[in-house]
Structures are given as C-alpha cells and as structure tokens.
C-alpha cells in the first residue's frame, strides 16, 4: 500500500471509530437486548421474540403507533405544503429576499427542548399567549384532540424551515430557459406551476418528504416537554413510549423492542411511499 492511501485511511479512522461507537454498536446491542428480559438484581433471561409478541398485545403500544402515524402524516403534510409556499414566495425577485430567507430559517437553529417550552407558554391555558389574545380558554394541553394539534403546530414551526430550504434549492435549480419557453405558450402562472415547476421539483419534493418522515418518526423532545405524552396517552409517540419503558420501568429489553418496531414501521412507510410514487409517475 502506498503512503498516500495510508494517510487517507488514517484521517478516516476517527470518523469510522465515531460511527462504530455511536451508531453501529448501539444498533446491534439494542437488537441483542431486545431478545432478553432484563431485571436488575437477577440474570438476564433470553425470551426470544417475547418482547415483540408483547408489543402486539400491548394496548399502549398500539395507541402509540396510532398517535405516531397521526403525528407524522399531519406534521409532514403541513410542513411540506407550507415549505413549498414559502419557497415559491422567497424565490421571487425582491429587495428584501435575503432578509426574508434569513428570518424563515431561524426556527431551525432552535433546540427542540427550547421549542417545547416556548410553545408550552404559548398554549398554557391560564395566561398563555394564544388564549390571552383570543380572550377564551381553549384546553390546548388538557384536551386529547387539542394536545396533539399543539404538538404538530410546535413541530411545524421549527421544521417548516427545513422543507423551505430544500424546496428553495430545488426551485433555483430549474433552468430559466424552461420558464422562458413556457411563457411563449401561456402566461397563466397556475398552469406553469402544475406543468413546469412541480414536475421539475418532484425529486426534491420526494427527498424533503422522505427526510421529514424519517425525522418525524423519531420525535421526542417537543412532545416530551410540551405534554409528557398526555393528557392520558393522547400524545404518546413511540419514542416516548420506549423511553418510558426503559427509564421509568427499567424494562430495557421491551424498550429496545419498541425502538426496533419503530425502525421497522419507518422502513415499511418509506417503501410504501416509494411504491406509490412509482405508480403515480
């Protein structure tokens, strides 16, 4: 081996160690302990697929799956649509275009925990910002229907910026010549959007949807700080249920099984989405 390739491998070594230590090892170790019943003070007992069978007979787990899918579908749909609208507006020539783009991406830099606490003060029933402005008491955090909506709104406030950035980049990659040729046929902006902009933007749009779906399935800080999974279990998403099983009840084997079921559901959802897109196009 030549000295230069060795130097390249040497520089890659820290990154490889980091990935092995914080991604590969936790993944396989989590899969390993999901086949065990782990009790403190006694030896771990191998139970095979017992934790996974338990998952399908656990009403709280089934509820967490339903809540997670409602959250993912609701939040991703709103974020992609808002992100697209904002990208279309920000892509127009304007003297304040740079300032507007900067302001639109600021929420992305906030930590999710801070966002959760921020919206807790906004949605608080007694003295909260929204109820104070409206002059009525809406049970944002104590009603199951409102609570999930509050979590989706908080998540949307932060992650719409992500969709906006990706879709804005996609819009800017469309050649001007295409619009010039389209303008010779029609001046109708709606037709140009549906027949020119949207088809060109399709790969970027799919990328934004897939990235947001993957992240939305892993949501934890915002619902945890905003509602703690309540009222009842109305905002208990799967990552929170896995955290509760592991950190509150110290059932680490079952907690790992919940996490891997989340991973499996994400893969199924993405495969289904890919097939739907292929059939549509």
Stretch-by-stretch model annotation:
Residues 3-281:
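A structural signal for multi-pass alpha-helical bundles of membrane permease subunits
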């Amino acid at each position: 081996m030549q000295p230069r390739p060795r130097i390249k491998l040497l520089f890659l070594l820290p990154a490889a160690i980091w990935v092995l230590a914080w991604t590969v090892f936790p993944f396989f170790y989590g899969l390993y302990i999901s086949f065990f019943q782990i009790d403190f003070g006694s030896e771990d007992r191998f139970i095979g697929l017992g934790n996974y069978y338990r998952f399908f007979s656990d009403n709280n787990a089934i509820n967490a799956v339903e809540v997670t899918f409602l959250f993912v579908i609701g939040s991703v749909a709103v974020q992609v649509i808002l992100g697209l609208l904002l990208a279309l507006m920000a892509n127009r020539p304007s003297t304040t275009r740079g300032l507007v783009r900067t302001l639109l991406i600021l929420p992305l830099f906030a930590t999710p925990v801070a966002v959760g606490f921020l919206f807790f003060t906004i949605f608080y029933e007694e003295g909260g910002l929204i109820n104070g402005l409206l002059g009525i008491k809406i049970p944002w955090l104590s009603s199951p229907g409102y609570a999930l909506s509050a979590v989706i709104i908080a998540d949307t406030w932060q992650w719409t910026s992500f969709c906006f950035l990706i879709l804005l980049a996609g819009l800017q990659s469309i050649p001007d010549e295409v619009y010039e040729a389209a303008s010779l046929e029609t001046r109708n902006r709606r037709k140009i959007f549906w027949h020119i902009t949207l088809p060109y933007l399709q790969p970027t749009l799919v990328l934004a949807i897939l990235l947001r779906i993957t992240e939305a399935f892993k949501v934890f800080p915002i619902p945890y700080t905003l509602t703690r999974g309540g009222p009842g279990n109305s905002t208990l998403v799967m990552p929170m249920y896995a955290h509760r099983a592991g950190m509150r009840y110290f059932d680490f084997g079952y907690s790992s099984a919940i996490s891997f079921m989340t991973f499996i559901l994400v893969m199924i959802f993405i495969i289904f989405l890919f097939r739907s897109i292929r059939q549509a196009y």
